[in-house]
Amino acid sequence: MKSKQNFFLKLLAAILICEAGLFVTSCSTARNLNELDSFSEPQEEQKKILRTIYSAGIKNAESLYKFFIAKCPDGNKAKAKKIAKLYITECQTEGINSDIAFVQMCLETNYLRYGNLVTKDKNNFCGLGAIDKNNPGLKFKSMKEGVRAHIQHLHAYGTTEDIPLKNELVDPRYKFVKPRGKATDIFGLAGTWAADKEYGAKLDRLLSELEEF
């Protein structure tokens, strides 16, 4: 009798251990499935670049550089890296959107290949003062000064009188932007900064491409 009791006790214990094992396995499996579900959920949507001139850019210098080289594989890589960093720094100082300024530079200079009135030696990255062959654009003494002049000109377009410049003025045409704040976003640059009515749309397309980097 006692041996039968021991047998049934051992059998019961074995059943309980087996069930416990199945429970643990089931829980582990469920946990793993939950982790997979969590992993497969879409990540937060990539932040969109603002089209407002007086705003913060979201791309770092490395992303700007990669965008430039993707669009211009034969471009000067060292110069592209340097100018990307300059745009980040100068824009942060004045509160101007560095993404907008950088793609505008790409559009205006054909990715630093130039080819119109403005020539490479001028350090003019946005066509400042370029009207005709008698007025082929302003010349700046360094890349940094040229980038700063570009940012300051955007500042004149994108901000009002109550927002002063932080750096010393190097843009000779800053004072000619009237009224101040005439183009708060890229679309306002069409017909103002450039005669091209599609100018804002062209910048918009470039920004959409930059968002992928």
Feature roles, as predicted:
Residues 12-22:
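Bacterial N-terminal signal peptides
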Residues 2-12:
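Bacterial N-terminal signal peptides that target proteins for export
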Residues 2, 23, 27-213:
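Catalytic cores of secreted/periplasmic lytic hydrolases that degrade extracellular macromolecules
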